[in-house]
Amino acid sequence: MAVNYSAKEEADGHPAGGGPGGGATAGGGGAVKTRKPDNTAFKQQRLPAWQPILTAGTVLPAFFIIGLIFIPIGIGIFVTSNNIREYEIDYTGVEPSSPCNKCLNVSWDSTPPCTCTINFTLEHSFESNVFMYYGLSNFYQNHRRYVKSRDDSQLNGDNSSLLNPSKECEPYRTNEDKPIAPCGAIANSMFNDTLELYHIENDTRTAITLIKKGIAWWTDKNVKFRNPKGDGNLTALFQGTTKPVNWPKPVYMLDSEPDNNGFINEDFIVWMRTAALPTFRKLYRLIERKSNLQPTLQAGKYSLNITYNYPVHSFDGRKRMILSTISWMGGKNPFLGIAYITVGSICFFLGVVLLIIHHKYGNRNTSADIPN
């Protein structure tokens, strides 16, 4: 129903007078001021308004239309999600039978590093490009103090922030009277396990090529993260700084390739994008399909070699490796499809119930008989 309010020609609400001999005056002739709002449609709350009237003729079709739209969309998303290949290995080593159990109690400074190997079998081939992720559980990257513990100016290559990091980085701002680069708790806790994948055929191990470039967002790689400005090599540019406390080597030694070293190292950039939930995964490597005639990872036996550097047992965390393909909607996530199907089904069911009620009671006389 449309309800229109039109401003009528009315008095402005101010006291009459102001001319000679008319109206109240104060102190010799000024008009008495008033706090009453002006007589306008806006200030007097007379703007046009529209209010829908909910009838069976409008509500029932809306329920059925929503149901008929949401259910097919949900089925399509759910089927697409189920077609994504995914394989997950938990290599925390909590179980005594796990090959990585010997590495469970490693610390940040454990030398030599602990290594373990987990053999597994892929029942189905992975046809398209494969994405390798590492996953952590019970790790709260969304903690307020943790999220703030970084210096974006330093990470963007500002030379003054390099030698004088933000106080938000405390207690990982300086070490031994030298500024830490990169500073903060996020950088200090960077994931540093090394994962290697091998295909086993006829007792022969063949290394799977893992691509380490292209795993970070373009805007992060080219805009948010920059190395310090200067013409020298990274060792000279980072002179006067020290590495994070838990790192085994400084930031300018993260990679041998200049375009993937320092603050623009893609493993580092991926880690610095904090997760919203305590159980998360981050992209580690890419496995590209080399031939349209051969699957990227064919069904068969594989082994995962792990250099176990990252301690999680102290906070009851878990670590895992995930191999996954993707689709137009991203990675495997059945929740979205289930949500669409559920909402569509509820709307369709309510439409049927309300249609029955309307058919049974809609034509009854609603006027009340008042006895004499």
Swiss-Prot record:
GO biological process: phospholipid translocation
Residues in the Exoplasmic loop compartment per record: 80-336
Cytoplasmic side: 1-58, 358-372
Keyword set, alphabetical order: Cell membrane, Cell projection, Cytoplasmic vesicle, Disulfide bond, Glycoprotein, Golgi apparatus, Lipid transport, Membrane, Transmembrane, Transmembrane helix, Transport
Residue ranges crossing the lipid bilayer per the database entry: 59-79, 337-357
One Pfam match: CDC50
Compartment(s) of residence: Membrane; Golgi apparatus; Cytoplasmic vesicle, Secretory vesicle membrane; Apical cell membrane
Gene Ontology annotations for the cellular component aspect, listed alphabetically: apical plasma membrane; endoplasmic reticulum; Golgi apparatus; phospholipid-translocating ATPase complex; photoreceptor inner segment; photoreceptor outer segment; plasma membrane; transport vesicle membrane
Keyword presence, Transport: yes
Topology term for the membrane: Multi-pass membrane protein
Glycosylation sites: 105, 119, 159, 192, 202, 233, 305
Disulfide bonds: 100-116, 103-114, 169-183
Region named Disordered: 1-36
This protein's domain notes: The N-terminal domain seems to play a role in the reaction cycle of the catalytic subunit such as ATP8A2.
Subunit structure: Component of various P4-ATPase flippase complexes which consists of a catalytic alpha subunit and an accessory beta subunit.
Physiological role: Accessory component of a P4-ATPase flippase complex which catalyzes the hydrolysis of ATP coupled to the transport of aminophospholipids from the outer to the inner leaflet of various membranes and ensures the maintenance of asymmetric distribution of phospholipids. Phospholipid translocation also seems to be implicated in vesicle formation and in uptake of lipid signaling molecules. The beta subunit may assist in binding of the phospholipid substrate. Required for the proper folding, assembly and ER to Golgi exit of the ATP8A2:TMEM30A flippase complex.
Protein name stated in the entry: Cell cycle control protein 50A
Native organism: Gallus gallus (Chicken)
Gene that specifies this protein: TMEM30A
